[in-house]
Amino acid sequence: MFVRENYMQSVLRAGGIPVLLPEVEDEATAKAMIDHLDGLLLAGGGDVLPSRYGEEKLPACGEDDPQRDIFELLIIPMAVARNMPVFGICRGIQVLNVAMGGTLIQDIESQKGIPTKMHQQEPPYGAPVHTVRFERGSIFEAHYRRDGNADQQHAPSIH
């Protein structure tokens, strides 16, 4: 598994120690790993398989990572059961949603009529392409104190 350097540096700047977890399938090993963590950051990556939330895969779906799905869907409930902070970025928030019983819109353009160009950023990556509004009274609003801009590289969206 590849993790971008900026994820690691952000955890360090926040006072944490980043730990990469191997993608295991057995519950005992996963539990042992989770028991040694203070928080869980779910990084970006490929699409969550639609079968994980009870749907057939549409032709417009992007690249998926079945092994990662298995691992993350195993450890997320363990982290939540321990009241562990869990933070998802891109794919991470999507798999967190699925783990908590949610579904995804597989392809924003074909299912919702919103042009994919708005949501699948071309290089250079990282440039803001749309506005993010923070819920009033949320921890994000308290930290950022204003709405912001974000990049976007996924056709799927939380349903």
Where are the predicted features?
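The feature captures the ABC ATPase H-loop/switch
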Residues: I93
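Conserved G/P- and acidic residue-centered "switch" motifs that form tight phosphate/ATP-binding loops
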Residues: C90
